[in-house]
Amino acid sequence: MKQGKWLDTSISFMSMSGYSAPPIFWVALLLIMVFSLEYQLFPVAGRYDLLYEIDHVTGFAIIDAFMAKGEYRAHALQSVIEHMVLPCLVLALAPTTQVVGLMRSSVAEVMSQNYIRAARIKGLSNREIVTQHVLRNAIPPIIPKVGVQLSSMITLAIITESIFNWPGIGRWLLDALASQDYASIQAGVMVLATLVLTANILSDLIGAMINPLVRKEWYANK
């Protein structure tokens, strides 16, 4: 709510760190050295411990572990979750900080508008101002930009899967490139392109649907 305070400064520092973050493979190796090798909190690589046999029904490790039968299902599910922590953290670190920075800029722009001053003059509390005015006007411009983040996350996923030995479409593409399997390369690129295009279209539509200005234009054109 207040620019220049410790919370606003922390968010600004976090967002700038995301834009100027070191390479993802360096971050991944650093987390492996600290949390896996030094403190032994999380596994180094793989999807789950080799002690458990999980049938590949859906291809999603956490769903397959949940659907597995046997007395060790809970332990297998815990193993899958522990193996997911570091890859998910590495994959989400840079995009999350960038989205937080975009959200901060959007909130700061909304807070400087005249209707926010009018709401304060009316005696509305900070909570009412944030929920009824700030978020409703700050979130819609961010949603299309979040959809654009998907293309960069796919690139990060390819590197993350290779480092953590996690089987996925990114590692599958790298194996196809190594073996010169052009049919698999074409299929993988087509799937990723369709996924990115669909995500961008949906993010634009959702952002337009919840944008008050766009809704007013739609109602006016009816």
Name each model feature, range by range.
Residues M1-D8, D55-K222:
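Alpha-helical transmembrane segments of integral membrane proteins
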Residues M16-M84:
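Generic hydrophobic transmembrane alpha-helix motif, especially the helices
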